[in-house]
C-alpha cells in the first residue's frame, strides 16, 4: 500500500459531481443490537441531511407459519418440557416487538429532532424491508440480524438488499461511533466512484481523516487519478490520505489492503470498474460499516 498525506489547500477548480440527494432515509428495525445501531446512525444522518426518517418493522410470516406445523415446539429456559407454539402467543410477541421498535424510533427521532414515520408490514422479512424502502433515497440496515447463523457475515436482509435493491445502502454494526471514525472510499476514476467520494465527504466528521483508496486502471494512472480527485475535495477537509491499492479482483486480498489503511466507514459503489460480484464479496468479507452508493 502506498500512502501519501496531503493538506487540502490550493485545490484545482475541477467540476465536482454532486452526491445523490438524500431526502428520506429508511431503516429496518428488529430490536437487535445491529439494528438499534443502524437506527441511531440513520437518525443522526437524517438530522444532518434534513431528511425524513422512515422506520420499518416486519412481522416474519415464516415464524407465523411455524405454528401451523404439528411437530413445532419451543423449549423455554425455565420450562421442564417442550411446549407447542401457539399462534396467539406468537402474535402477541410480534406486536410487543413492534411497539419496542416504534418506541426506539420515537426516542431517536426526538433526540435528533427529525421528522419520522413508522410502518408495520407482514411477510418475508428481507423482501418486505426492501419493498418498504422503495420510496426512500437511502436504506439503513444492520450487517446482521437476530439469527446466530449470520453473526460473522451479512444477514439475510442485508444480502437481499444488496442483490434486490437499486437503493444506496448503509450497513451498520454495534459499537460504531461516527464522530470518532475515519471514512475510507474506493475510487477508480469512474463516475460511480466519484459519486461515492462526494457522499464520503458528506459523511466525514470535522477533524477526522478521509482515506482515498485509489484503484488505478493502468500504469501511472494513480498520479492523474489523485490530481483529478483532489479537485473534488472542499477546502474544509484538512486530513486526507491517498492509498494506492493493487489491481486485484479477489475480495479477500482487497479487504486485507483496506485493513492496512485504517478502520472506519467504507464507502464504495458496485457500479465502478471493479466487478459488482467482487464489491459484494468484499462487503461480506470485511467487517466494517459499509455505505454502498448507487446513483
Describe each PLM feature range.
Residues 100-117, 236:
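A structural motif corresponding to the C-terminal end of an alpha-helix
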Residues 42, 105, 129, 200, ...:
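Aromatic/hydrophobic pocket-lining residues that form π-stacking "cages" and hydrophobic walls in ligand
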Residues 120-127, 245-251:
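Charged docking surfaces used in two-component/phosphorelay signaling
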Residues 2-12, 21, 35-41, 47, ...:
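Gly/Ser-rich helix-loop-strand patches that form or flank binding pockets
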Residues 116-119, 147-150, 189, 242-246:
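Short, flexible loop segments at the rims of nucleotide/cofactor-binding pockets, characterized by
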Residues 4-84, 179-244, 263, 285, ...:
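Small/aliphatic-rich secondary-structure junction motif
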Residues 82-92:
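Short glycine/proline- and acidic residue-enriched helix-loop micro-motifs
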Residues 90-96, 121:
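Active-site beta->alpha loop and helix N-cap motifs at the rims of alpha/beta catalytic domains
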Amino acid at each position: 500500500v502506498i500512502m501519501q498525506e496531503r493538506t487540502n489547500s490550493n485545490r484545482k477548480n475541477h467540476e465536482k459531481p454532486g452526491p445523490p440527494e438524500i431526502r428520506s432515509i429508511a431503516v429496518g428495525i428488529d430490536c437487535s443490537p445491529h439494528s438499534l445501531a443502524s437506527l441511531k446512525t440513520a437518525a443522526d444522518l437524517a438530522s444532518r441531511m434534513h431528511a425524513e426518517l422512515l422506520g420499518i418493522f416486519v412481522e416474519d410470516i415464516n415464524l407465523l407459519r411455524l405454528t401451523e406445523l404439528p411437530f413445532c415446539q419451543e423449549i423455554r429456559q425455565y420450562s421442564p418440557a417442550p411446549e407447542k407454539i401457539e399462534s396467539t402467543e406468537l402474535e402477541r410477541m410480534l406486536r410487543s416487538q413492534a411497539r419496542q421498535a416504534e418506541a426506539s424510533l420515537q426516542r431517536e427521532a426526538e433526540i435528533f429532532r427529525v421528522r419520522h414515520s413508522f410502518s408495520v408490514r407482514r411477510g418475508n422479512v428481507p423482501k418486505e424491508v426492501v419493498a418498504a424502502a422503495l420510496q426512500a433515497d437511502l436504506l439503513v440496515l444492520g450487517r446482521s440480524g437476530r439469527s446466530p447463523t449470520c453473526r460473522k457475515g451479512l444477514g439475510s436482509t442485508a444480502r437481499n438488499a444488496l442483490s434486490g435493491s437499486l437503493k444506496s445502502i448503509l450497513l451498520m454494526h454495534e459499537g460504531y461511533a461516527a464522530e470518532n471514525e475515519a471514512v475510507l472510499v474506493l475510487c477508480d476514476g469512474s463516475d460511480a466512484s466519484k459519486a461515492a467520494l462526494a457522499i464520503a465527504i458528506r459523511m466525514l466528521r470535522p477533524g477526522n481523516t478521509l482515506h482515498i483508496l485509489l484503484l488505478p486502471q493502468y500504469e501511472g494512472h494513480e498520479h492523474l487519478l489523485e490530481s483529478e480527485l483532489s479537485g473534488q475535495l472542499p477546502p474544509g477537509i484538512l486530513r486526507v490520505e491517498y492509498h494506492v491499492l493493487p489491481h486485484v479482483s479477489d475480495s479477500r486480498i482487497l479487504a486485507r489492503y483496506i485493513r492496512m489503511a485504517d478502520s472506519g466507514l467504507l464507502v464504495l459503489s458496485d457500479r465502478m470498474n471493479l466487478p459488482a460480484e467482487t464489491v459484494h464479496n468484499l462487503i461480506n468479507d470485511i467487517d466494517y460499516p459499509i455505505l454502498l452508493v448507487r446513483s
